[in-house]
Amino acid sequence: MIKKHVLLSILGLFIACTVGAQDNSMADEKAIVKSGNMRFTVLTPEMIRIEYSAKLQFEDRASFVVINRHLPVPNFTQEERDGYLYLTTDKLELRYKLGTYPVSNDRCNPNLQITLDVNGVEEVWYPGKQDPYNLKGTTRTLDRAEGDVREWLENGLLSRVGWAVIDEREPRKDGSLSLMFERDTNGGMDWVAQRKDTAALDMYFMGYGHDYKKALGDFTKIAGKIPLPPLYVFGYWYSKFQRYTEQDMRDIVNEIRSRDIPMDVLVIDMDWHRNGKTGSTDGTEWTGWSWNKALFPDPAGFISWLHDEQNLNTTLNLHPADGVFPKEDNYDALYADLAGRYSDIKADSLTNEDGTIRWNIENKDFYEAFFEHILRPHENIGVDFWWVDWQQWMIAQNEPNLGNTFWLNHVFFNDKKLQAKNRPFIFHRWGGLGNHRYPIGFSGDSEATFSSLAFQPYFTATASNVGYGYWSHDIGGHNQEGANDAELYLRWIQYGVFSPILRTHATAAGHIERRIWKYANFEQMRDAIYLRYALIPYIYTMARWSYDTGVGMCRPMYYDYPEADEAYRYEGQYMFGNDILVAPVTSSDKGTNVSEKDIWLPEGKWYEVMTGELIDGGSVVTRSFTREQIPYYYREGAIIPLYPRMMHLKKRPETLTLQFTPGARGEFNYYEDAGNNADYQTACTFTRITQNTEAVSYTHLRAHET
């Protein structure tokens, strides 16, 4: 059983944390070795950048993937002998045949190879070598996914063979490339630029063996940290694609509050705007930018009510690709601004024949004018963040090889960042490697089936293999045939408790119900949401830990147990932070109300929270769970901070419950900040909590290295 419950008063103390150096795309000269048309940069003992340019036009600008190359120079040696260049670190040996192109057809004696030791086995890599053991990453969307669609996943940064390669010149799945950033020296947004030598090779070899956490940590050193979302993001989101009126949404909020259901985000889907093309209020075009006053007669008043009286945050859904129609409220202002900015471009590049201003977000003038005239008015009345939905081309129309998804994420996220008011984030799909810098991910329109639910724990944890730690799924499923399934919805919500974002959602079909109080098992669903809010102190601390380490909150078992075969086989379970193992029920109990599940518990003791049993690990156990029970386990010695019952996260409680799990000595560094401050890197505090068999101690930490 849990050994102790301790109430700890939360001190309102914010102590500055130490901030590391700013990103610098220029590597230290001491890390660079040139040989003819080749350039090598030794970034860490396990990571080497490899470039080839027949024009000797090497890139020092930031790319879509890599924004920082100025790392401490590791120890390495370089030597030329017998016609080869050798670079040797503590972990790798690179051999390059002088004067040759690095890619060759001779697999026995390649022009370039890197050798490393993986648990006593010598592994040899050469350009073009395939890896069937890559542990995968993620994909752009789960739109129309039903069940296991792992074949959609891109390769990740981790592999059981011990190495992986970031190839900056390899096309992404959407057909785009990793392009370059042109630095804005005036403090504005860095903008897309083409490479100097489009035929150059540019790749990063990562030979970390099975030290997966170090691989991800070093990746985020060169590719940027995983930003920490605002605290309220980790609460419950209510969402439904439905032609709601303002009064409908007020009624839903009041129903939620009257039934003591915690909530922090109300999502307003696309019917908030009128038909952009016709100006009509009785039907909706995908693209639109002006409020439908027939449905929302007082948008500013409504959002003020959400913020001030209901303690909620909100977002609006966008489908931007059709541009800005002439009947939009601020069309004239946008047209006049762009006409002046586009003065050196033919008039027909600004609009279509019907006068619609073309969508051209890859143009910086368009970005600045569009945000000023179209989006800023909505932000000024309180829209907190943007949900950028689909309906644009995969590749930008006016910039070669530019992926629209990645670029929209970059622009929307950094626009919020430049405002410097609150913590920036964007709600959109995955745009490819480097997209971890722009959370949060909207996984799209999956099917409402148990098989789709069963895939999501694996999918979400595996995304951490590319640093993408914040997928938000349509809890309950998006597309649904047939009647509502109370068991499926409950199990999906229970999984959502232990996923990065808890957001219920579905498409506009009238028969699909996402209001949990409409179900007979409402109290079980609400109890799951209560559990989510109780765990917020732990979740938020783990989110900060992800920012600091590059390791996602939801992560596969093999990060912690890389040499255990079970860690790779039991894909439906995962670590939720450092101390909680979760194995959600993702199949129907066929009316028995009890589900059996095989769970691999690693070495040590594990506290099964739902039953109160302390179980010996090191084996696979078969456990039974009623519908209200969620299979999750505390590691022995774990200290889990919990909030008391609460309805929202805008005002946090003054007390904290600490649950101590018996067994080994435990420690937890409890994290706090203002919740939505843009300067969380510096304005924060950590409290170290430790336990042994005799005592519990609390220590405020004065600084934290980031």
Model regions: which residues?
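Bacterial N-terminal signal peptides
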Residues: 9-16
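A low-complexity, Ser/Thr/Gly/Pro-enriched, surface-exposed linker/loop concept
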Residues: 45-82
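Catalytic and substrate-binding clefts that recognize carbohydrates or anionic sugar/phosphate headgroups
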Residues: 79-230, 240, 253-258, 624-644
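A conserved hydrophobic secondary-structure block that centers on an alpha-helix together
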Residues: 146, 240-262, 266-269, 273, ...
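Aromatic- and carboxylate-enriched substrate-binding clefts and catalytic-loop regions
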Residues: 262-525, 560-562, 570
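Catalytic core of carbohydrate-active enzymes
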Residues: 435, 440, 465-466, 470-473, ...
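Conserved small/polar residues in nucleotide/adenosyl-binding loops
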Residues: 699-706
